[in-house]
Structures are given as structure tokens and as C-alpha cells.
């Protein structure tokens, strides 16, 4: 359901943002 999708986004978004920030540093 949509709840599971939102849960995945909530947990995955911080990781994705951190990854993007690390990519910009290099």
C-alpha cells in the first residue's frame, strides 16, 4: 500500500541526500 511506499521514502531519502552531498564534495 501507499503506507509502505511512504515508509521507504522516509527511510531512504536521508541516505539519498547524504549520497548526493558526498558526490558534490568530490
Swiss-Prot record:
Site keyed Important for the flexibility at the center of the helix, flexibility that is important for the stability of the voltage-gated pore: positions: 14
Residues with Glutamine amide modification: 26
Keyword Nucleus: no
GO CC annotation: extracellular region; other organism cell membrane; pore complex
Tissue: Expressed by the venom gland.
Disulfide-bond pairs as recorded: none
Highest taxon above the source species: Eukaryota
Record has Repeat as a keyword: no
N-formylglycine sites (modified residues): 1
Keywords, in A-Z order: Amidation, Antimicrobial, Cytolysis, Formylation, Hemolysis, Ion transport, Membrane, Porin, Secreted, Target cell membrane, Target membrane, Toxin, Transmembrane, Transport
Subcellular location: Secreted; Target cell membrane
Assembly notes: Monomer (in solution and for integration into membranes), homotetramer (in solution and potentially as a toroidal pore in membranes), and potenially homomultimer (as a toroidal pore in membranes).
Described function: Main toxin of bee venom with strong hemolytic activity and antimicrobial activity. It has enhancing effects on bee venom phospholipase A2 activity. This amphipathic toxin binds to negatively charged membrane surface and forms pore by inserting into lipid bilayers inducing the leakage of ions and molecules and the enhancement of permeability that ultimately leads to cell lysis. It acts as a voltage-gated pore with higher selectivity for anions over cations. The ion conductance has been shown to be voltage-dependent.
Protein name: Melittin
Natural source organism: Apis florea
Taxonomic classification: Eukaryota, Metazoa, Ecdysozoa, Arthropoda, Hexapoda
Amino acid at each position: 500500500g501507499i503506507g509502505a511506499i511512504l515508509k521507504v521514502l522516509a527511510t531512504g531519502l536521508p541516505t539519498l541526500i547524504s549520497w548526493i552531498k558526498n558526490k558534490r564534495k568530490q
